[in-house]
Structures are given as structure tokens and as C-alpha cells.
């Protein structure tokens, strides 16, 4: 079976290595990984083509790197995946700009920004009847004199 795609991972931490290993085990492919630093768990791996690029998570650099691979493999689909939150905005911002052979399975930047904003996300859940945990978003102006509309146990986490 001829492999008709090239996985491209943005980020060089253990998540990227694990995904590259999964692609190698499933398809026998070598994954291209873009990282910002020469020292990485991905550097020196036989299953990874590790490419160091400064400011790799910037919108312009993501487009530059992905376009480089698309031109290098014009006869294959290029599957772009971010391995870290800092890459999501840059990948989504470039959706309209990628070459024809690039697949980036992400939502538009507008939708991404809506989904990562907790209050907007829960409003969408309510609108479409999707269950979600009861939530209170604390705003600085609320001070200390507020009551939760539900009993514990509960989880408190910063946004």
C-alpha cells in the first residue's frame, strides 16, 4: 500500500513524539516535526524528520513551514496537526491560505475563539441542548460576597 500522506506535527514535546510513533507504527511513515529548539525528544529519532525553526508557533512561520512541506511533496496530502495549545491559533488562522494538498482538521479561527471562551462555549451548549457541568464564571467585580447556585463538591479552575 502506497502511503499518500505526510504527517506534519507542530511542536516537539513528548506529545509530538508519541503521535509520530503512532503514525510510524500504523503506517510506517516518517513524520515531519517542526520544533523551536535543537534539543528535543524528537531530535535524533529515526522515525522523525525533525526541523528546527525559530518562532515556529507564529502565524507566518506556520504557513511558511506547511507550505515548504506541501511543495516538497506535491503529490501527497499533507496532514497538519498541532501538538500544543500555542499552535492552534496559528493553524486555524492559516486555514484559507494553505496549499491545495494540505489538510488541517481544525475549525476557523472565529469558531476556535468562541469555543475556548468558557462563557461563549456554555452559551452554545445551552442553545443546542448539550449537557455541561453547572458553571459560574467569576468576574473580579463580584468581590467576595457572591453565592454559588449549586452545592459542592465542585472544581475551581482558572480560565
What kind of region is each of these model predictions?
Residues 114-159:
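Active-site nucleotide/adenylate-binding loops and adjacent lid/helix of ATP-dependent enzymes
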Residues 1-110, 127, 141-145:
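ATP-binding N-terminal substructure of ATP-dependent carboxylate-amine bond-forming enzymes
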Amino acid at each position: 500500500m502506497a502511503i499518500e500522506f505526510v504527517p506534519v506535527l507542530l511542536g516537539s514535546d513528548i506529545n509530538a513524539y508519541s503521535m509520530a510513533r503512532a503514525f510510524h507504527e500504523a503506517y510506517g511513515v516518517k513524520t515531519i516535526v517542526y520544533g523551536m529548539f535543537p534539543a528535543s525528544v524528537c531530535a535524533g529519532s529515526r522515525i522523525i524528520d525533525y526541523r528546527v525553526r525559530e518562532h515556529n508557533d507564529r502565524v507566518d512561520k506556520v504557513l511558511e513551514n506547511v507550505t515548504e512541506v506541501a511543495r516538497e511533496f506535491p503529490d501527497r496530502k499533507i496532514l497538519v496537526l498541532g501538538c500544543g495549545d500555542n499552535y492552534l491559533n496559528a493553524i486555524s488562522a492559516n486555514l484559507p491560505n494553505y496549499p491545495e494538498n494540505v489538510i488541517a482538521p481544525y475549525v476557523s479561527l472565529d469558531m476556535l475563539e468562541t469555543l475556548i471562551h468558557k462563557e461563549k462555549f456554555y452559551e452554545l451548549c445551552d442553545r443546542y441542548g448539550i449537557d455541561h457541568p453547572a458553571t459560574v464564571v467569576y468576574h473580579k467585580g463580584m468581590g467576595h460576597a457572591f453565592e454559588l447556585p449549586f452545592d459542592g463538591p465542585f472544581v475551581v479552575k482558572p480560565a
